[in-house]
């Protein structure tokens, strides 16, 4: 070790001779070592020391993690007293109002560099051969203040004199051995747990542990400093333990949760361990300081946690790792149970830099890497149905193109206490895009929110990722009328945007579009084949589906065009919030596309049947735990299981009755007349896949309405390769039979039923050569693209029929 320390001495700058500030101590990953001036735990920090007998002003200095003085972060106009200290919080904030919050983070996964500049020269830096950190919450610094000898500090001392005891990175202790792994057990059982030292533990090593969620400290050790600890666990207990030894570094603790759940485990269980003061302390606690929407900006703090996820009783956790949490939401911060976000990062644990688990295999199969996720309390729906947002998003996103937040129910324990049931949700920010778009990180992302300032509804835009230039240019573009669909397509994915609008308007979500909307796009740095235009991430639709007694007759389309008629419901329908949509709908092609989507969705899945199917899935998953959750929070209307069933049934009835009203709202707004009943394949229920006006139906039966004189274009294929659609039979207001797998007609002024006619055979016309194939009509491939040069053996569409060149 002495040889290493001598080498470090020769590699570092001779700062003492220059009589300037020096880098004295750093921490590459600050979990809970020190809190900053805004009551956060900064990601990392650098301590500067003034070794002189006179005060030094920081304004003459810059600091960076790169040897580039011009781009280095300028320190503020502050004085460091003689032989004094100052902490620079390296959290990538770099804002003037944050004073000592630099615009970079220290590297934790590999060698770390820090440069201190004055007069355009490097006056101090870290030793050149520094390796990656041995563990979080371990500091690296000079043995004593300003000394030339560097090493890992046995005790971190941010803002104070260095401890005088250092060692090499390899002098780090191993984790204690748990004789039993954490698990979920029945209430009437017990666990005999032994904690012991690892095989390579040095002489003098001992075990410290806690059962209250805190990170254990040497002061938690029993007087005899035990080498083994035996615990008989008979109630839900969280154990955090680590090894300590004089002259050695201790990593963060290992944690195991022993959950004695009083019911059959039907949904995943999360166990979170953290210091109780991080939640309930009046000055720094997340729960104690997040009880209103105003706290979102004041107390949006993060706190360190260990988090485990269990998916089956008697089995080990799916993951068990360090992370951070914060409170999520606006008005919902006032709920008795808070929504919480959980973050993974390599600086907590290089081996677990993500939550690597397939949370939603039934909804988003194959998505396994998450930077963060939330446990949501239902938002505005907390004291009512609890699942409105999940029901709405899942119903629609299961059938159409949407960027959305998948959902499952879960139980939460914190420090061994049952907190109730929340919903596991994907995020509605850049982390959603990272998970769903193969790790895409080069984004522009803007969140639109509503604020009431001086009793005036405000439309706020927060640029969370990337730049603002493209978005501002987009606003300039759409603020002017007269653009075509093709022009809008250059700026925004019109198809996806209209899906989002149709969903929110059908379900009566009035907390949108002037709130709860996120625009994103791959920016110019992104390496992707995607168009670099905006899409929307769906979030927080819980104001829909009859929340607060809003009837299914409520006219969201009229609210869009006449917000002054709805003074109690128009906060999200200000002019800045609705200009984009209203100007888009002035284009005939976009308007027709929107009307088609609404009408076709309602006859397919956006109705009582489709919504009810989602409700049944969620109810079946959550019901047993929902009853216990209800008992914990004791809301007045929750008297029995039947009361809960009634709430779910009320939501089904709302959705069942909504289409009739929404069809009429559409007809009234755009003078389309009275909608007429239209069914497709309802009587025969043939096993076919049907496309209606370029919208592929999810169900093989369409049961909805349509408007007089609007074009109906249908195509269909059978799932049986030995059969094909050979024609269509129309009955009702008109009675006619049409040949071919494709049908185009106008909706008559009356009700009609359309049934596909199924014939034997593939339905593919065989043509002898390519010249004959081209002779009698334009060719298209199966995706609808024109084909000029057909290839032998491939199937094409000609005059609505499948053909193949032999």
Predicted segments, located by residue:
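Intrinsically disordered, low-complexity linkers and terminal tails enriched in Ser/Thr/Pro/Gly
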Residues: 18-192, 196, 202-205, 242, ...
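Conserved ATP-binding subdomain of kinase catalytic cores across diverse folds
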Residues: 272, 295-453
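Middle-to-C-terminal accessory/interaction subdomains
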Residues: 158-170, 268-269, 277-300, 305-306, ...
């Amino acid at each position: 070790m002495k040889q290493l320390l001598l080498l470090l001495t020769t590699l570092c700058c001779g700062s003492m001779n220059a009589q300037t500030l020096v880098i004295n101590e750093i921490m590459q990953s600050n979990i809970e070592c020190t809190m900053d001036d805004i009551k956060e735990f900064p990601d990392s920090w650098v301590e500067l020391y003034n070794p002189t007998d006179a005060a030094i002003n920081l304004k003459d200095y810059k600091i960076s993690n790169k040897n580039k003085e011009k781009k280095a972060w300028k320190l503020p106009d502050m004085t460091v007293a003689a032989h004094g200290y100052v902490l620079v919080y390296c959290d990538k904030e770099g804002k003037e109002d944050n004073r000592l919050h630099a615009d970079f983070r220290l590297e934790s996964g590999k060698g770390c560099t820090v440069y201190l500049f004055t007069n355009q020269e490097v006056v101090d830096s870290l030793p050149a051969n520094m390796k990656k950190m041995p563990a979080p919450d371990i500091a690296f610094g000079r043995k004593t203040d300003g000394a030339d000898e560097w090493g890992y500090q046995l005790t971190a001392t941010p803002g104070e004199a260095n401890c005088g005891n250092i060692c090499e990175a390899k002098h780090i202790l191993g984790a204690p051995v748990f004789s039993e792994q954490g698990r979920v057990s029945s209430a009437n059982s017990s666990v005999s747990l032994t904690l012991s030292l690892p095989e390579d533990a040095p002489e003098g090593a001992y075990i410290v542990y806690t059962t209250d969620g805190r990170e254990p400290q040497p002061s938690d050790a029993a007087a005899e400093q035990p080498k083994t600890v035996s615990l008989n666990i008979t109630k839900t207990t969280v154990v955090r333990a680590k090894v300590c030894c004089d002259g050695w570094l201790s990593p963060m603790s290992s944690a195991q949760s022993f959950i004695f759940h009083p019911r059959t485990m039907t949904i995943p269980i999360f166990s979170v361990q953290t210091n109780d003061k991080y939640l309930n302390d009046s000055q720094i606690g997340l729960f104690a300081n997040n009880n209103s929407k105003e706290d979102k900006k004041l107390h949006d703090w993060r706190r360190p946690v260990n988090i485990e996820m269990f998916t089956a009783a008697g089995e080990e956790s799916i993951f068990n790792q360090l992370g951070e949490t914060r409170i999520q939401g606006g008005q919902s911060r006032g709920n008795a149970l808070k929504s919480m976000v959980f973050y993974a990062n390599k600086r907590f644990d290089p081996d677990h830099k993500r939550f690597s688990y397939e949370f939603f295999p039934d909804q988003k199969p194959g998505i396994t890497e998450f930077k963060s996720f939330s446990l949501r309390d239902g938002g505005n729906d907390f004291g009512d149905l609890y699942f409105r947002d999940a029901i709405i998003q899942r119903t629609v996103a299961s059938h159409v193109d949407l960027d959305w937040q998948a959902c499952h129910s879960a139980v939460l324990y914190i420090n061994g206490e049952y907190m109730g049931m929340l919903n596991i949700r994907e995020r509605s920010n850049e982390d959603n895009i990272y998970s769903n778009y193969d790790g895409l990180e080069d984004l522009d992302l803007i969140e639109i929110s509503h604020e009431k300032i001086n009793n005036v509804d405000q439309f706020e835009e927060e640029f969370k990722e990337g730049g603002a230039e493209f978005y501002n240019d987009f606003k300039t573009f759409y603020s002017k009328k007269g653009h075509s669909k093709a022009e809008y397509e250059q700026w925004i994915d019109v198809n996806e945007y209209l899906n989002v609008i149709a969903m929110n308007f059908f379900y009566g979500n009035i907390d949108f579009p002037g709130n709860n909307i996120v625009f994103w796009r791959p920016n110019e740095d992104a390496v992707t084949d995607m168009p670099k235009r905006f899409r929307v991430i769906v979030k927080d639709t819980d104001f829909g589906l009859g929340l607060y007694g809003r009837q299914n007759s409520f006219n969201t389309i009229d609210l869009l065009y006449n917000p002054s008629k709805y003074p109690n419901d128009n906060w999200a329908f200000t002019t800045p919030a609705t200009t984009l949509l209203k100007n888009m709908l002035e284009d005939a092609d976009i308007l027709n596309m929107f009307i088609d989507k609404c009408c076709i969705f309602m006859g397919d899945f956006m109705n009582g049947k489709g919504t009810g199917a989602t409700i049944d899935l969620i109810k079946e998953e959550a019901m047993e735990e929902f009853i216990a959750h209800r008992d914990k929070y004791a809301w007045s209307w929750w008297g029995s299981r039947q009361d809960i069933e009634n709430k779910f049934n009320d939501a089904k009835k709302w959705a069942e009755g909504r289409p009739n009203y929404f069809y009429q709202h559409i007809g009234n707004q755009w003078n389309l007349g009275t909608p007429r009943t239209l069914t497709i394949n309802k009587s025969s229920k043939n096993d076919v896949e049907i496309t209606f006006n370029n919208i592929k139906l999810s169900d093989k039966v369409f049961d909805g309405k349509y408007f007089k004189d609007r074009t109906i274009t249908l195509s269909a294929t059978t799932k049986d390769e030995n059969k094909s659609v050979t024609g269509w039979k129309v009955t009702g207001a008109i009675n006619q039979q049409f040949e071919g797998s494709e049908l185009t007609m106008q909706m008559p002024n009356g009700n009609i039923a359309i049934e596909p006619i199924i014939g034997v055979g593939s339905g593919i016309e065989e043509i002898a050569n390519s010249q004959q194939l081209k002779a009698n009509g334009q060719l298209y491939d199966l995706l609808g693209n024109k084909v000029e040069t057909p290839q032998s053996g491939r199937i094409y569409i000609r005059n609505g029929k499948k053909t193949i060149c032999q």
